Design a protein with these regions (language model features):
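Amphipathic alpha-helical segments typified by the pilin-like N-terminal helix
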Residues: 1-25
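Alpha-helical assembly-interface signal, strongest on the long, hydrophobic N-terminal helix that forms
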Residues: 16-40
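Periplasmic/extracellular, small/polar-rich flexible segments of pilin-like filament-forming proteins
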Residues: 32-102
Length: 102
């Protein structure tokens, strides 16, 4: 009983940290795929998930992770991600420099 009272909340917190790491990793991966697209297109094209998903640029979102590109130009790129299983419902944002917040 006592062990379960300690272990179960810790396990839940551990799972949430893993979900949050997955959401951040998806932002990093979409940023790298967009960088490759912009290198191919001289930085002028919008980066969309349709363009970077698949063999050419390799982006594939993880299961249960929603990633949205909110600003598709290289100069002011922004994207968000959230893992649907994360109990804290934390939405992460990446800017044009690759910085992730929160």
């Amino acid at each position: 009983g006592i062990l379960a009272a300690i272990a179960i909340p810790q396990f839940s917190a551990y799972k949430n940290r893993a979900y949050q790491s997955d959401a951040k990793a998806n932002l990093h991966n979409i940023f790298l795929a967009c960088k490759a697209l912009w290198a191919d297109k001289s930085g002028t094209d919008d980066c969309t998930t349709d363009l970077i998903t698949g063999a050419d640029y390799g982006f594939v979102a993880s299961t249960n992770v929603t990633v949205n590109i909110t600003s598709a130009k290289e100069a002011n790129f922004a994207a968000t991600s959230i893992h649907t299983s994360d109990a804290s419902n934390t939405t992460y944002t990446m800017d044009e420099n690759g910085n992730i917040t929160p």
